[in-house]
Amino acid sequence: IQQGTYNNKLYALGAMESSVGLYYNKDILAEAGVEVPDADHPWTWSEFTEVLKKVQPVVEKKKGYALDMTFPTGEATIYYYAPFFWSNGGDFVNKDGLKVNGVFNSKENLETVNYFKSFLDNGYMSKVQITDLFESGRAAFKFDGAWEVNTIYNNYPDVNLGVAPYVVSDNWDGGRYTPTGSWAFAASSKTKKLKGATKLVQWMSGVESGKRLWDESKSFPSTYEAFESSPIFEEDENYK
């Protein structure tokens, strides 16, 4: 609701949910002697750095890296990694969305960028993208969307998958910082076929569409009713 609202008016409704999590290989972490925290006690930056240090010798035997992480051109980079900036007290624009200078280039954001840089400096991630590094069992961690669960289940069944809470800054204020949101559907008020466009938007953002999106593409539905129609969201720990 919030993402499609402007000046207290609703303009668009999300058709699916595209949360991102920190995926991990249970076997690698077990070999390294690493325990995963619960959602209320996520790893801080310093703690996660120590974890990466512990798993690095294990993945090096597999010719891999502790972290399967890249910064591709496009919306994925800002979507996946914005919570790192937010949990450190940073942001990208001011509250009215009109000012960048002094916000994007803040001290807090520089700290976040330097934290990312430490992954490279310490060899915890590759300098170039390696296709399916995590999926092939050669990385301990990967930040990815909810769709990754289905991809691994179907194409990489040997990966012992787990999902951990997002890593937070050492200055964490206790809030929840995780990518969440959706592609949304809307209709222009000036369209020539408003009635038909309205029906399409209603269906695409409704319960039945959510069920179909889940059945066909394993995209998380955006309505509670569609979620509750499938028992997997209660039975599978990686979907909860």
Where are these predicted regions, by residue range?
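Paired acidic/hydrophobic, glycine-rich loop segments that form the ligand-binding mouth/hinge
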Residues: 140-144, 162
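Periplasmic solute-binding protein
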Residues: 2-38, 69-97, 179-187
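Hydrophobic residues within well-ordered alpha-helices
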Residues: 48, 55, 133-141
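Extracellular/periplasmic bilobal clamshell ligand-binding domains
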Residues: 209-211, 225-240
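Glycine-centered hinge/linker elements that transmit conformational signals in sensory
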Residues: 49-54, 90, 95-127
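Extracytoplasmic/periplasmic substrate-recognition and gating elements
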Residues: 32, 107-110, 114, 121-125, ...
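Bilobed periplasmic-binding protein-like "clamshell/Venus-flytrap" ligand-binding domains
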Residues: 11-12, 56-73, 206-217
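Hinge/lid segment of periplasmic solute-binding proteins
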Residues: 1-21, 46, 51, 60-63, ...
